[in-house]
From Swiss-Prot:
Annotated source species: Daucus carota (Wild carrot)
Top-level taxon in the UniProt lineage: Eukaryota
Family of the protein in this entry: Belongs to the plant dehydrin family.
Record flagged with keyword Phosphoprotein: yes
Compositional bias segments (type: Basic and acidic residues): 11-25, 46-80, 109-124, 148-158
Pfam families from the UniProt entry: Dehydrin
GN (gene name): ECPP44
Induction line: By stress compounds such as sucrose, sodium chloride, calcium chloride and abscisic acid in shoot apices.
InterPro entries: Dehydrin, Dehydrin_CS
PTM info: Phosphorylated in embryogenic and somatic embryos. Not phosphorylated in non-embryogenic cells.
Gene Ontology cellular-component terms listed: cytosol; membrane
Protein name from the UniProt record: Phosphoprotein ECPP44
Length: 258
């Protein structure tokens, strides 16, 4: 029985050894694969680093400046923050405590305090202006005497009273040929000239009468000249006949024959 038990024990040990040796081989192969992948990855990274260009010094400076600007808050942002903080502090805040509302005291900002001080200074500097009525000027000795004289006070009153405005000149109706409402440019200019008086209907009638009388006189003068001419001609002929006896014979014969 003892020999039988020993045989299977040896067989079991052998199987375990083979299994362990097989596993060791597979594990070794797996490790080698891992090492190969690591080597390939490192080579690829080195190639990529070599192919990429090195960053320039100027580009680095620009990037640093932009980062600094972004980090530093601008003046407008600071003012906006200060204004928002002052407004939030000055605003009324209501807090409920046990169902009751209580208002916190207003915290005034710097701007409001400065404005209040300025207003106070302006109020202090403003001086109340008093309206002073000027007393009447002192009258001289002569003026007092004139007032006491009869008629002196009336003159003063007359001087103070303003004279009435002059009456408006009445519009002059001008008789114009054709439509009386329509006037020519020359007539309007003549009306504006000082000392010009537009012609009325009576003046025009007088002019017509004067023209007619002048025509009659001219006609009378023409007739008088005609008579004078004939008379002078006849007188001349008579004188010629008186002083020229040669013409007497034919005239006498002409008279007797007739």
């Amino acid at each position: 029985m003892a020999s039988d038990d020993s045989v299977p024990q040896h067989s079991v040990e052998k199987t375990t050894e083979y299994e362990s040796s097989d596993r060791g081989l597979f594990d070794f192969m797996k490790k080698e694969e891992k090492d190969e992948t690591k080597v390939i990855a490192t080579e690829f990274e080195e190639k990529v680093q070599v192919s990429e260009p090195e960053p320039k010094y100027e580009d680095c400076k620009v990037v640093e400046e932009e980062e600094e600007k972004a980090a530093k808050p601008s003046l407008l942002e600071k003012l906006h923050r200060s204004g928002s903080s002052s407004s939030s502090s000055s605003s009324d805040e209501e807090v409920e405590e046990g169902g009751e509302k209580k208002k916190k005291k207003e915290k005034k900002g710097l701007k409001e305090k400065i404005e209040e001080k300025i207003h106070h200074k302006e109020e202090d500097t403003s001086v109340p202006v008093e309206v002073v009525t000027e007393p009447e000027k002192k009258k001289g000795f002569m003026e007092k005497i004139k007032e006491k004289l009869p008629g002196g006070g009336k003159k003063v009153e007359e001087e103070t009273v303003a004279p009435p405005p002059p009456p408006a000149a009445a519009p002059v109706d001008c008789a114009v040929e054709g439509d009386p409402a329509k006037k020519g440019i020359l007539e309007k200019i003549k009306e504006k000239i000082p000392g010009y008086h537009p012609k009325t209907s009576t003046e025009e009638e007088k002019k017509d009468n004067d023209c007619a009388s002048a025509k009659l006189i001219i006609r009378c003068l023409d007739r008088m000249f005609d008579y004078y001419y004939y008379a002078s001609f006849s007188c001349g002929v008579g004188l010629i006949l008186c002083f020229d006896p040669l013409l007497w014979g034919p005239l006498i014969s002409f008279g007797t024959s007739g």
